[in-house]
């Protein structure tokens, strides 16, 4: 019995898709993925070559990133530049998240490192330090001291035009963010850095307390052993004293018996002498 052909798609239709969607899928490049699938897929780990390229691209587009808060197009240009350098394709959002995470890691290490000590062994610490050293440390929103104040109209024109590299007109990067939606995240990260610093300062105190507690326990055990040894010596001395008293008592008894024998001998001699004289 042969089944009749159903209304479902034929094998040729499955193997050779037709229509606008099929043609688009066939003509489109293999690396293009839908935004939903791209958003939910697992991000690949960054290789060492990608990280070195990212440092160079970040330094190249650093001034351009500071000119505006809405810099998605700048990140896309950075992604294209990184693709030209390494041959690896990354989204602008991936580069944005990676730069944010690396900036947080750099600030955490800088907070935990003294100015006189050697820099951390993180391989990208010095490179990020050189990139972020381009901006001043203050974040009060004022212009640098080298920029003289002018009329309000000139200030408006200067704010609209791209700033020159010699006199940058952007907010400092260390504290004032160029991404408005990450302000709350940075405040949380700064509080976490402070708590981390306080924890690192509390650790030596706790360590000293534990060491002093162990030392006190050792001293207590030593004192208990010394007291027990003293008691044992006291018992031995008491036993020796009792033995000495017993020996002295026996010696006294022997001396008394010896005196009695001497008296008896003297009395016998006197009797013998009296008998011989008679």
Swiss-Prot record:
Query: Tell me, what is an example of a GO biological process annotation in this record?
Result: positive regulation of DNA-templated transcription
Note the superkingdom of the native organism.
Answer: Eukaryota
Ranges of residues in domain Myb-like: 44-129
Q: Which GO terms describe its cellular component?
A: nuclear body
**Name of one Pfam family that matches:** Myb_DNA-bind_4
Family matches, as InterPro entries? Myb/SANT-like_DNA-bd_dom_prot (IPR026095), Myb_DNA-bind_4 (IPR044822)
Which intervals of the chain are annotated as region Disordered? 1-27, 138-168
| Gene3D superfamilies registered for this protein in UniProt | Homeodomain-like (1.10.10.60)
Name of the featured protein: Myb/SANT-like DNA-binding domain-containing protein 1
């Amino acid at each position: 019995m042969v089944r009749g052909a159903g209304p479902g798609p034929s094998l040729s239709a499955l193997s050779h898709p037709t229509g606008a969607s099929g043609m688009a899928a066939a003509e489109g490049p293999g690396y293009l993925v839908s935004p939903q699938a791209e958003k939910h897929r697992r991000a690949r780990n960054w290789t060492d070559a990608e990280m070195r390229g990212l440092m160079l691209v970040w330094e190249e587009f650093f001034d351009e990133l500071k000119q505006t808060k809405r810099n998605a197009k700048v990140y896309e240009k950075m992604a294209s530049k990184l693709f030209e350098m390494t041959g690896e394709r990354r989204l602008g959002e991936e580069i944005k998240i990676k730069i944010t995470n690396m900036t947080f890691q750099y600030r955490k290490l800088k907070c935990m490192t003294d100015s006189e000590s050697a820099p951390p062994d993180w391989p990208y610490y010095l490179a990020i330090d050189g990139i972020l050293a381009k901006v001043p440390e203050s974040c009060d929103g004022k212009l640098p001291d080298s920029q003289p104040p002018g009329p309000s109209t000139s200030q408006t024109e200067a704010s609209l035009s791209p700033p020159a590299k010699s006199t940058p007109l952007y907010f400092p990067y260390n504290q004032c963010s160029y991404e408005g939606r990450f302000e709350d995240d940075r405040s949380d990260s700064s509080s976490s850095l402070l708590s981390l610093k306080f924890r690192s300062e509390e650790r030596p105190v706790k360590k000293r307390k534990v060491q002093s507690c162990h030392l006190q326990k050792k001293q207590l055990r030593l004192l208990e052993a010394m007291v027990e040894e003293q008691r044992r010596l006291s018992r031995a001395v008491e036993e020796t004293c009792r033995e000495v008293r017993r020996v002295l008592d026996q010696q006294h008894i022997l001396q008394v018996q010896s005196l009695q024998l001497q008296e008896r001998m003297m009395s016998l001699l006197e009797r013998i002498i009296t008998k011989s004289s008679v």
